[in-house]
Structure formats: C-alpha cells, structure tokens
Design a protein with these regions (language model features):
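Short helix-capping/hinge SLiMs at alpha-helix to coil transitions
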Residues: 43-49
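Acidic beta-strand-to-loop metal/phosphate-binding motif
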Residues: 382-386
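Active-site-proximal, substrate-binding regions of enzyme catalytic domains
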Residues: 1-41, 52, 58-66, 70-381, ...
Length: 537
C-alpha cells in the first residue's frame, strides 16, 4: 500500500533528526524529481522540462500527499540550491519563475532507496498481518476499510486543524473496530509490527505538516498555558472510559516534559462538580447510569467515595493532577455569556448551559493571548478539549488567517512533536497511536450520557408505542457515537427527526424478523436431520 509505505518512509527519514525540512521534505522532493526524470525520455531533446504541477502530481500519485503549490515551488528551488557545484555541472539543473518551472539534462537521486525499500517491506508486512488477522476472525475484507484509510483518517483530521479550516473529511463506510482489535492483538506478541504501526502514525503527522505548510522553523516556547476541558480532567482522573485514561495521562506528562503549564478554569471545576453530583444522585453498582458511575465500578470506588471527593473537589483535583486553578472575573463571564457564540452553540446542544462554559473557556484564552496569532507555535494559551464538534465550532468562529483557541489531544501531541523531533519522535508516536485507538473506540461506542440524550430527545419529540420504543433502542444500542450524534443534530427539524427514527425502527424490525425466520429455518433443519437419523435407526 503506497500510503502506508509513504508514511513509514517519512518517519524513517526523520529518525534521529532535528530538521524535518532538510532531512524529510527535501529528500522526498529529490526522489520525486528523480522519478519524474525517469518517466521522461531525453532522446528527442537535450533537456527535460517540468513544472510545479508535474511534481505536485508525482507527490500525490506516489505518496498520497497533497502538497500546496507554493510549498512545491519552494522545495523545487531548494532541490536546485542543495546541489553541489559538481552536481550542477552534471545535471544542468535550473529553476525558473520562482520554482514554477525547472529543467535539467539528467537527474537521479538514489540516496534514500535503501530506506524506502526497507519501509515498503515493513508496511507490506503490516498490511499482510492485518489481512491475515481479518481472515482468522472470519471478517471479509470487502466490508472492512483498508488499514491505510484508518491511518489516513488521522492525517486528514490533523490537516484540517493545521489549515485552520473545517475540511470535509469523507465518511468511510464500515467500522474501524477491526483495526483497533488488530493493533491490540499485535501490541503484545508482535512488537516489531506494532513499532511499524507507530512509525506509520508518525509519518501521517509529518504528512499533515507538509500538506498544510506548517512553519517548521518557528519554535514552541516554554511556559505555554494549557487549560483542560471537563472530559480531559475526568479522563486524567480515570473517571471516564478505561481506554481514555493512559493516553490522557501520557499527554499531560508530555506537556510538562516540553515546558508547558497545565491549568484549570474555575468554571470547569463547577461543571465537573455537577457531573459528579449527577452520578451520585443516580448511582447504581449493578446498572451504571453515567460514565463516571461506570468508571467507579471499574476501579472499585463506591458512591461514598464519590460524595467524599465532590465535597473537596478543587483540592482533590489540584492534588491528583498537580494543577493550578484560574478564575474568570464575573464581569468577564457576563460579557462572554452574552456573546453571539453562546447563542449559536446553544442551538446545537441538548444541555444549553454547557455552551456558556465552552465559549467562555475559549474566549478567555483569546483574551489572554492579547491579540490574534498567526503561527500555532506562538500561541501562549490553549483550551484542550476532546469535543470535536466544539473544536470545529471554534474554528468556524475565529478570524480567518489566525489560530483558533481550542486544540484536541491528538492535535496537541502532534504540535508538541515540533518542540524537539529528534527527542520526542518515539514518545509522540506511542501517545498518538494510543489516542487514535481511544478516539476510534469513542466513535464506535456511545457513552451513557449520549444514550441518555437521545432517550430524552425521543421521548420529547416522538410519539412511539412501547413496542416501537423497544425496537428503536435495540437498534440505537448498536449504533456508533457518530450516527447517534447525527440523529441528535436533526432535533431542530421535528419532521426529519421522526422520519429518521421510524426508518431505524423499520430497519430493526426487518432485521429482527429476518433473524427470527433464520432461527426457525435452522430449527426446522435440525429437526429434519434428527428425524432422518431416527428413521435410519
């Protein structure tokens, strides 16, 4: 698979290096121009001509990376200036119109072929292992997205963030659970394959930098302040899903290791208090009703423990996570609460009060920055959230050309990689792949809170019989987080919402009827076989 090979190749080039531009981008373009030269015949002419579009197409075709044309021109020029005097005399390499065009009599570049061939073998071994795993689990490849699509989803998300736009990321038909299960399978007994997966993940991060033209020369300062959103705090405390705990805790370590400061806002403490209070009021050991409740059962904590920590929540969190708390002035909160952003975000929320918290948090960051920032590395304050819809909303409400205030864990991990690529490559690839696994699980399995939200919405907006309600929830229990969220987005259009609900009911009814019929047929066949055996006896 070209994409897997490409990402593994990029990561291998960056290994033990500090300058990604010189050690990754430049060799990539030298190899692309060499490939272009090999495809062109110089028999009819003494020289070969090409354009920026030609090299852009080669990079996309051979590596699956869409490099902006201005970056292509810059790197074409860089290839020319990187040549020694002897090479310039041999190749007669010239560029024109600031990198728009080039010509040479001959050009070849073989310095990285050994690395490329090795990474191609590694990528092919991983792909083959994935295909073998699907067969062992009796899963059809036709119904499962490719492994490159799983990794590419991460690159697309990162490219969206670094471009500062809500880029359209095409939904892939099928679940990515097989990919997560495969990674968990090889992590224990097939360490070499898992290392390849980590390397490919890191390559996808580097590809996102190249696709969006991230300024690699700009360095990240120390003492940057990171405010944590509610869910991030709960994950760090191991009070959310089990798979979210380690990646979040590792991210906090990475922030500190790169000179960052972790803080919470007082409004976030208040929001966490309400969430824990809800878990206390509805606590059940046998049938957990909230994610916090579910986590307590998993880690062996009871209702009394929850009551205890909620009574001293601020001091508990400060001690557990070693963080400071910042307050927002009442006058500022009043100002933030009246912003247009709050009203717009409320329209997308079941729980309207959460919109005030989220908008106030990123507007506080905006104020603390004291002006618009154009480079990600120069932002002194961030609001770290796991809420993709909030992150997208923030991007839509920022000033074009400037950096948004929210950042998701996988985006922050990738950004921190630029602090010291040589030192942080292994750690970032480990944390990042774990974050991708956790994010995939979150997208596949709806939280207790999301199930409760859709339940409330159905009861308020749809008139269903008891039978239809039970059939509907048999279906919803199997739906992914993304599908349930899309259903919730239709609440404002009652007709469309009800239409979608009844479509789910009919599909589930048909599915159950088919299952029942198949069961009857199997029972009938079983009885016929038994009857034949008795007749023979």
């Amino acid at each position: 698979d070209n994409v897997l090979t490409s990402y593994s190749f990029l990561a291998a080039l960056s290994e033990n290096e500090t300058d990604i531009y010189k050690t990754v981008y430049l060799p990539l373009f030298k190899r692309a121009i060499s490939s272009y030269a090999a495809k062109k015949s110089s028999k009819e002419s003494n020289s070969i001509q090409g354009t920026d579009i030609d090299i852009q197409s080669i990079i996309l075709e051979e590596y699956g990376i869409e490099v902006p044309i201005l970056i292509v021109r810059k790197l074409i020029k860089a290839v020319g200036t990187s040549l020694s005097k002897k090479e310039r005399n041999i190749f007669k390499f010239d560029t024109f119109e600031d990198g728009k065009a080039f010509q040479f009599t001959n050009y070849n570049y073989f310095s990285t072929e050994e690395i490329y061939d090795r990474e191609r073998r590694n990528a092919q071994a991983l792909q083959q292992a994935f295909e073998d795993y699907l067969k062992s689990e009796n899963l059809s490849e036709k119904n499962i997205p490719s492994f490159s699509q799983f990794i590419d989803k991460n690159k697309c998300n990162l490219s969206s963030f670094f471009s500062g736009k809500n880029c359209l990321i095409h939904d892939v038909e099928g679940s990515f659970m097989a990919h997560v299960n495969f990674l968990q399978h090889i992590e224990g007994g097939y360490h070499y394959l898992y290392q390849t997966a980590e390397r490919i993940y890191l390559g996808s991060v580097i590809a996102s930098f190249l696709e969006t033209g991230v300024d690699l020369e700009s360095k990240i300062d120390d003492n940057i302040i990171y405010y944590l959103d509610t869910q991030i705090v709960l994950e760090a405390l191991d009070l959310q899903k089990a798979e979210d705990t380690l990646p979040t805790q590792e991210l906090l370590k990475l922030i500190r290791a790169t000179g960052g400061k972790i803080r919470l806002l007082d409004i976030t403490i208040n929001e966490i208090h309400k969430i824990i209070e809800l878990a206390i009021n509805n606590y059940s050991k046998s049938h957990p009703t909230t994610t916090v409740n579910e986590a307590c059962v998993r880690i062996g904590k009871n209702k009394t423990w929850l009551i205890s920590i909620n009574g001293k929540l601020e001091s508990f969190i400060k001690a557990e996570l070693q963080v400071d708390i910042d307050g927002i002035l009442e006058t500022k909160m009043n100002l933030y609460s009246r912003s247009e952003d709050v009203n717009l975000l409320k329209q997308t929320r079941i729980h309207k009060s959460t919109a005030i918290h989220d908008v106030a948090a990123y507007l506080h960051v905006r104020d603390r920055r004291e002006g618009n920032i154009r480079l990600f590395q120069k932002a002194k304050y961030w609001f770290v959230t796991a809420n993709k819809k909030l992150a997208d909303f923030n991007i839509s409400r920022k000033t074009n050309g400037f950096v948004n205030e929210t950042i998701m864990p996988e985006e922050l991990t990738s950004l921190l990689f630029l602090k010291n690529p040589q030192k942080l490559a292994k750690k970032v690839s480990q944390i990042g792949l774990n974050e991708l696994i956790a994010q995939t699980l979150s997208e596949e399995y709806a939280s207790k809170e999301l199930i409760n939200e859709i339940d409330i919405a159905i009861k308020e907006s749809a008139d269903l019989s008891a039978e239809d309600y039970n059939i509907l929830f048999s279906s919803i229990a199997l739906q992914s987080t993304n599908k349930i969220q899309k259903l919730l987005e239709e609440i404002s259009d009652k007709r469309k919402f009800n239409e979608s609900i009844h479509n789910l009911i009919e599909k589930e009814r048909t599915k159950q009827a088919k299952s029942k019929e198949e069961k009857i047929q199997r029972q009938k066949q079983f009885e016929e076989v038994n009857h034949e055996k008795l007749s023979l006896e």
